[in-house]
Amino acid sequence: MNFCSKKGKTCLTDRKRGGKHMPQSMVHIENLVKRYGDLTALNHLELDIREGEIFGLLGPNGSGKTTAINCILSLLKYDRGQIKIFGEEMKPDSYKLKEQIGIVLQNVAVFDELTVQENIDYFCGLYIRDRKRRKELVEDAIEFTGLEDFCKMYPKKLSGGLLRRLNIACGIAHKPRLIIMDEPTVAVDPQSRNKILEGIQTLNHQ
């Protein structure tokens, strides 16, 4: 557990590193500033996350966690600083770079008119065109998230915990090198939360 304080701004992070050698930098942020009018959401943020790490941003609501994630994903324009993913500057048109990232947003983003399996196949298909390979990846994601018994169900019929697992399956099915999650366990029961956290640990070791 690391605690840091800079210019009156504090952050508490939960950090775990796998492997003994110095792994490659996945996310490198320098001097990142983001303002909303008179409100400074990110104040000269410095961050380096390396391959094999599980890294968590912890803080109260409004502390800038989601803003930081949106800036990393190039969903939000920032005022100053630089963000590099795998050593390359992240830009809105960095499509090849974005293919290596799995995104699990705070709000469940799936299609109500598609079944569990169809949703996973759709999101996987955004990155993987080969049907045979995509079928294998979808099956892997379903098995990994424990959704085998719910493949033909529609999202509206799922519990909160199952929806979260579906959200994760959609984000990781294409086997990305980097997975970014925004509060993946929010509003789920303790049992589902533990399963999700165990799954994240398993992903890190694969």
Report residues per predicted region:
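Conserved ABC transporter NBD signature motif
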Residues: G81-P92, K96-L97
